[in-house]
Regions:
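N-terminal basic/disordered segments at the start of proteins
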Residues: 2-23, 36-38
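Active-site-proximal beta-alpha core segment in soluble small-molecule metabolic enzymes
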Residues: 99, 103-133
Length: 133
């Protein structure tokens, strides 16, 4: 079955996540989210490898607190080690921290991964602190 779809893309601006260009004339990107505990470092690495080998271009991890930020740092380090020692059958893709409610966690995660995903609605409570950058 040969299905031809035509559509007009909205005009957007290019942005980059790590070395990956998104938007504008660039192709739609494949993003997935790990379903392992971010603190299960070895399990997360194995799942990341599987996702990247299957073609994922962005990989998101839930990041509830500082412990997960540290785990993400270790995951990133191990994936890069595999790439540099030649044992990887994949290219390391940008990692994304999925953060809710905690601006300090988002700030810390931004030092570790290429992208931090937040829900801005989570930050509207004036009782919560948010650092102006």
């Amino acid at each position: 079955m040969d299905i031809q779809l035509t559509y007009n893309r909205r005009t957007t601006t290019t942005t980059t996540v790590g070395g990956l260009s998104i938007g504008s004339e660039h192709p739609v990107r494949i993003q997935t989210m790990a379903n392992t505990s971010t603190n299960d470092i070895q399990g997360s690495i194995e799942q990341a490898k599987s996702c990247m080998e299957a073609g994922a271009e962005l990989l998101r991890f839930t990041t509830q607190g500082m412990r997960e930020v540290e785990s993400l740092s270790q995951i990133r380090t191990e994936l890069l080690k595999m790439l540099h020692d030649g044992s990887a059958l994949f290219n390391v893709v940008p990692l994304v921290a999925d953060v809710h409610f905690q601006s300090d966690v988002a700030d810390a995660a931004a030092q570790v991964v290429e992208k931090v995903r937040i829900n801005p609605g989570n930050y509207i409570d004036p009782a919560r602190k948010f650092k102006q950058i």
